[in-house]
Amino acid sequence: MGVYHGPDLKKITGGKKRRHRKVKRKYWMGRYPTNTTLAENEKRKIERVRGGNIKVRLRYAAYANVVDPNENVAKKVKILRVLETPANKELARHGIIVKGTKIETELGVAVVTSRPGQDGVINAVLIERK
């Protein structure tokens, strides 16, 4: 079941609008969010999207590619826990990782710079060393 992102059939005042076509279009459909969470094993889902392209969704994450700005070196490190999410505090409460989430890793606290539900990988920048 998809999510409908097409034009609404209600006016701001609450009245009904008339449809300008009889059927809904496929390009008006969306998808549900991935809600990437922590787990022991990573799991990715590959989907075909509009135009025949491929989107890799990261469903469960265990590791992140963390860049240390001082040394300018990237390392693959284990994620220990989700600290906070500026986008929505409920996401942090459920342990969901999105862009901008602060995560605790083996190196220290890092901020996620990639979109795990769109890219299929977690990239982060170290902001606080242990």
Swiss-Prot record:
<dbReference type="Pfam" id="PF01201">
    <property type="entry name" value="Ribosomal_S8e"/>
</dbReference>
<dbReference type="GO" id="GO:1990904">
    <property type="term" value="C:ribonucleoprotein complex"/>
</dbReference>
<dbReference type="GO" id="GO:0006412">
    <property type="term" value="P:translation"/>
</dbReference>
<keyword id="KW-0687">Ribonucleoprotein</keyword>
<comment type="similarity">
    <text>Belongs to the eukaryotic ribosomal protein eS8 family.</text>
</comment>
<dbReference type="InterPro" id="IPR001047">
    <property type="entry name" value="Ribosomal_eS8"/>
</dbReference>
<dbReference type="InterPro" id="IPR020919">
    <property type="entry name" value="Ribosomal_protein_eS8_arc"/>
</dbReference>
<keyword id="KW-0689">Ribosomal protein</keyword>
<dbReference type="GO" id="GO:0005840">
    <property type="term" value="C:ribosome"/>
</dbReference>
<comment type="subunit">
    <text>Part of the 30S ribosomal subunit.</text>
</comment>
<dbReference type="InterPro" id="IPR022309">
    <property type="entry name" value="Ribosomal_Se8/biogenesis_NSA2"/>
</dbReference>
<protein>
    <recommendedName>
        <fullName>Small ribosomal subunit protein eS8</fullName>
    </recommendedName>
</protein>
<dbReference type="GO" id="GO:0003735">
    <property type="term" value="F:structural constituent of ribosome"/>
</dbReference>
